[in-house]
């Protein structure tokens, strides 16, 4: 297991915008934009019918099914390699404005004092996404998607990563904590909320359908922003209406990423809100820090007063029962100062009630701890040691 490589929290707020890919950034499934045409003569429906049928028959993950189907159908027809998948990716059509969206939004965030990071969380193929023009231009901080393992000739031989609608959510937690490596178990480590690199309130999730619902719900429940998009050519809003009705999304807009579009205006408004909100969050955590310091100081003061009261009570104890009760309370205190230890040593030598029962189990344990905390050897500590050893 790899060691945790956690990205440190920035000195400016980070807004992570996470995208599904198919029908969110692109009008169609990526496999239907080159690959299926090569092996199925363009019969897209048949490919998905057979793939989904195989998943149902073998109780198989649908993403594993399509990955198997892609490799199986390519055999003897086309040479399927990592390079050819990236080449298919280069043919994928993108919605209007996507080409310059990522850098334009980054620059807008920069003007507002907010660091913008773009992430892909998709059930599509990582290799095809990496072949798109936007990915090659460095649009994405990280691409989380299904992918193959390849042999030394670049031929896919086994699934390396499978991303389905439920395990998509893990990547949101990775982004939140800055632990981006998919094999880094540090994502499970505890961090105080103020140390999260990208708290959920600063996560935007943009998707189009049911497969995005777990991520949308998680973002919504934790104060983030979920956006449903629909194709502006068909104007079919049935999916986003359903998601809105079920409280899965806060907003919906056409998948139009051009400057001045509804989506552009909405995301910029979220950036503006993030800039203002993070000022308030910063003030909140400053107040929290001061409150914690004050609370700790108060606890220390109360603890010190309690210890002094117990020392005074022990010094004046006139019965064995009272002495045992006081010692019982003192055993609950973890730390004693040097001055307090010295007072307790004097009491053991001067108060006959205490001195007489030094060999009793609870009193003996307590005074051994006091001698250890005191850490000095002199006539007084030597005498205490003798009394502890000899039982008077």
Model-derived regions, located:
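Low-complexity, intrinsically disordered regions enriched in charged/polar residues
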Residues: 30, 41, 54, 58-61, ...
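Long, compositionally biased charged/polar accessory segments in the mid-to-C-terminal portions
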Residues: 53, 346-347
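C-terminal cap/substrate-recognition subdomain and adjoining C-terminal extension
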Residues: 96-119, 123-339, 347, 355-356, ...
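C-terminal accessory/interaction regions of large nucleic acid-associated machines
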Residues: 353, 363-367
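Alpha-helical substrate-recognition element adjacent to the catalytic core
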Residues: 2-152, 243
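Long, low-complexity, intrinsically disordered N-terminal extensions of eukaryotic proteins, enriched
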Residues: 1-9, 14, 46-49, 312-315, ...
């Amino acid at each position: 297991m790899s060691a945790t490589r956690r990205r440190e929290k920035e000195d400016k707020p980070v807004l992570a915008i996470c995208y599904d890919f198919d029908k969110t950034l692109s009008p169609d499934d990526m496999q239907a934009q080159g690959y299926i045409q090569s092996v199925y003569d363009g019969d897209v429906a048949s490919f998905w019918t057979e793939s989904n049928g195989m998943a149902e028959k073998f109780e198989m993950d649908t993403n594993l099914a399509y990955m198997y189907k892609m490799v199986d159908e390519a055999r003897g027809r086309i040479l399927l390699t990592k390079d050819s998948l990236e080449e298919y990716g280069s043919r994928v059509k993108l919605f209007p404005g996507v080409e310059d969206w990522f850098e334009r939004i980054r620059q807008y965030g920069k003007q507002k004092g907010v660091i913008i990071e773009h992430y892909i969380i998709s059930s599509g193929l990582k290799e095809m996404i990496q072949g798109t023009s936007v990915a090659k231009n460095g649009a994405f901080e990280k691409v989380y998607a299904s992918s193959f393992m390849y042999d030394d000739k670049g031929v896919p031989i086994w699934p390396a990563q499978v991303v389905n609608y439920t395990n998509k959510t893990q990547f949101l937690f990775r982004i939140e904590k800055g632990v981006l490596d998919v094999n880094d178990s540090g994502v499970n480590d505890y961090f105080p909320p103020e140390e999260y690199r990208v708290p959920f309130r600063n996560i935007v999730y943009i998707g189009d359908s049911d497969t995005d619902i777990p991520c949308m719900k998680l973002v919504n429940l934790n104060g983030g922003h979920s956006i449903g998009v629909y194709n502006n050519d068909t104007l079919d809003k049935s999916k986003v209406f359903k998601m809105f009705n079920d409280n899965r999304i806060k907003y919906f807009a056409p998948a139009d990423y051009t400057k001045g579009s509804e989506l552009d205006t909405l995301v910029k408004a979220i950036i503006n809100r993030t800039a203002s909100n993070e000022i308030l969050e910063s003030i909140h955590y400053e107040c929290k820090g001061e409150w914690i310091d004050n609370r700790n100081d108060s606890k220390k003061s109360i603890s010190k007063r309690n210890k002094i009261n117990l020392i005074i009570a022990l010094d004046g104890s006139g019965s064995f029962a009272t002495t045992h009760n006081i010692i019982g309370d003192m055993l609950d205190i973890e730390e004693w100062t040097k001055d307090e230890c010295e007072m307790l040593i004097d009491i053991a030598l001067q108060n006959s009630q205490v001195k007489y029962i030094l060999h009793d189990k609870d009193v003996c344990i307590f005074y051994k701890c006091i001698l250890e905390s005191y850490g000095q050897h002199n006539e007084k500590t030597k005498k205490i040691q003798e009394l502890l050893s000899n039982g008077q």
